[in-house]
């Protein structure tokens, strides 16, 4: 009789531990899904986000509005580099080939490559075939972080 109670108690402890681990795993998964990219720096006052969801093919366009006092954050952030005359054409090429017409809200796409200037800040993540890329461009004149993502 004592032995049966010990087995039952052990089974209940295992079940409780399994439930706790399941809850922890769910919390981790949910927090990972809702977290933004490291390149989207906290402190923006407003944002406009346009996503075209697909199973594997999707296009994103977002704008994050900052105050002028936030400019220094981009300068000090390790994810960002400064736009120079040597890399400006490469950065512009990603925006030029960005297929915004495929977006559900294509009329919301208002980015002009003339907005890219030396002294702005950018971060670029690109796949090997140019079929997957993310570009983050912080325009120091307008204090807007532009984000485009293309995955086909």
How would you describe each model-predicted region?
Residues 27, 32-34, 39, 118-120:
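Generic hydrophobic/packing signal
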Residues 88-152:
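Extracytoplasmic electrostatic interaction patches
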């Amino acid at each position: 009789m004592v032995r049966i109670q010990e087995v039952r108690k052990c089974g209940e402890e295992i079940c409780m531990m399994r439930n706790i681990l399941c809850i922890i795993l769910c919390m981790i998964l949910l927090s990972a899904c809702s977290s933004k990219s490291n390149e989207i720096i906290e402190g923006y006052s407003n944002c406009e986000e346009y996503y075209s969801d697909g199973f594997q093919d999707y296009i994103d366009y977002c704008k994050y509005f900052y105050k002028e006092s936030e400019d220094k954050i981009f300068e000090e952030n390790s994810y960002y580099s400064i736009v120079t005359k040597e890399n400006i054409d490469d950065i512009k090429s990603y925006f030029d080939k960005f297929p915004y017409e495929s977006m559900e809200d294509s009329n919301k796409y208002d980015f002009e490559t003339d907005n890219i200037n030396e002294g702005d800040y950018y971060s670029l993540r690109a796949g090997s075939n140019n079929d997957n890329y993310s570009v983050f461009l912080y325009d120091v004149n307008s204090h807007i972080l532009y984000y485009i993502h293309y995955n086909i």
